[in-house]
């Protein structure tokens, strides 16, 4: 569930670690992310698949440990419901699980780190916009706000070009260039 929130919503590991039960509103399908990296709070909406996953996780946890009090962390250790799972523990677990994925990492390329899930969310969002015919430039401020960045320039750092993203951007540019060229020739 933790990795699903990191990848599926582009949350920072500390934000997931600090989530309390009162921060999860399943009826409104929104998370309240408190005291982000820049000391602000933000609301992060989520869709039906993530809603189902969160709901199922909370139900399973409560069936084993009892109700989660509002101020208790969503992700805690079984022995102590008050003790949240620390970001370092989440990162350590991620690195322990990496070999299970059997990723082929080319020589000279660094092994993925936990924050790559956030980068993947940002790039995936751009890809979805391209495929839906949405101009990403008009929505970059939305993505920046969603990720809790102070400006779109902070978000741009996350937007690593991938082959798939390059192909989508190239197709969009080719369409733009063809339309512009037709008007110039007239």
Regions found by a protein language model. Give the residues of each.
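Conserved catalytic core of the tyrosine transesterase superfamily
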Residues: 1-186
């Amino acid at each position: 569930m933790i990795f699903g929130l990191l990848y599926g919503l582009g949350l920072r590991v500390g934000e997931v670690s600090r989530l309390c039960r009162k921060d999860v509103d399943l009826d409104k399908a929104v998370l309240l992310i408190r005291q982000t990296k820049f000391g602000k709070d933000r609301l992060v909406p989520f869709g039906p698949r993530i809603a189902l996953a969160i709901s199922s996780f909370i139900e399973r946890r409560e069936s084993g440990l009892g109700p989660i009090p509002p101020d208790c962390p969503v992700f805690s250790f079984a022995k102590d419901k008050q003790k949240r799972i620390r970001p370092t523990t989440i990162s350590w677990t991620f690195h322990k699980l990496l070999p299970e994925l059997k990723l082929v990492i080319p020589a000279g390329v660094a092994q993925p780190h936990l924050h790559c899930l956030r980068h993947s969310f940002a790039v995936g969002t751009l890809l979805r916009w391209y495929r839906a015919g949405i101009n990403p430039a008009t929505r970059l401020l939305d993505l920046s706000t969603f990720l809790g960045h102070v400006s779109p320039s902070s978000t741009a750092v996350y937007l690593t070009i991938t082959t798939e993203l390059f192909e989508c951007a190239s197709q969009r540019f080719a369409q733009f260039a063809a339309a512009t060229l037709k008007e110039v020739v007239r």
